[in-house]
Amino acid sequence: MKTILDVNNLFKSYGNNIAVNSVSFRVEQGQVFGLLGPNGSGKTTLLGCITGILLANQGSFSWFEGDEFTKARLRIGALIETPNFFPYLSAWKNLEIVAKIKGCEHSRIDRVLEEVQLLDRKNDEFKTFSLGMKQRLAIASALLNDPEVLVLDEPTNGLDPQGINEIRNIILQQKAKGKTIILASHLLNEVEKVCSDVVIIKKGEVLKSGKVEDILNSGKRLELAATDMDKLWISLSGMSGISNLQNRNGFIVAELNEDMNADFVNKSLQDSGISLNHLVLLKADLESEFLKLTQQ
């Protein structure tokens, strides 16, 4: 698979404050690649570095397997933080200005407005738009040059559920068209629903990276109950391959290592004279993995 972006030991600081600390990752063609981290984790700074807005102190990055950066930028559409539009100009007129700056044909304007479902509002002034519509117009501006890659920084920040869903659908539609998307977000649900791959960042450092599916499958947990809960707790505590026991809503929740499974646990407990009246394999979620990593 073709490598779209290769980041190697990127480091960026502001005086004594380290924003990005030796970050490395690789984005492959067709991925929706998530940068997940709490506010202040360095996501925006990292995106600023790889799009040429900021200059890193150390490390390197390359686009499209070593393509010259000035050429590579023409193949990238980026939305970093809040875009600036003229409030008294229409959506079409605002995009016309962006098209002139980017050297894009005006025929692209109606096309991208349709892609973000704003074609019927193209003659309305920007100041009349809702926050969600403003964000969709910003994505339209990033799509004007028909880029191979979209770089989006917190595209659903501050939006209501409907606005979030609209942006999510646009991202998935662009993925279906073959675009590679790099998405920075602090919203776990957003990354879990749209991203194929993720890097989890805290204080500028990578805590974990990989396929979202693999990260979800790595955190197997069991929810158990028996008539004698104290005896069950003691037995589970002494069982290898089980950790992080918790009492939750009248059940015991246990984390399993990769080699452990529910059938083995059930048989081992039966051999110890414990009959379970409740045994459920819990679906892992990105939130639990994220919280576990960021609280370490």
Identify what each model region corresponds to.
Residues G66-D67, G103, T227, D259, ...:
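Short, surface-exposed acidic/glycine-rich loop or hinge patches that mediate macromolecular interfaces
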Residues L5, K12-L183, L188-K202, K208:
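ABC transporter nucleotide-binding domains
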Residues N257-Q296:
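C-terminal coupling/interaction segments
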Residues E105, L119, I242-S243, S275:
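Short coil/loop linkers at secondary-structure junctions
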Residues R168-L256:
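ABC transporter nucleotide-binding domain
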Residues M1-F11, Q296:
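ABC-family P-loop ATPase nucleotide-binding domain
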Residues V112, F126, N249-G250, L282:
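Residue-level "edge-of-site" marker
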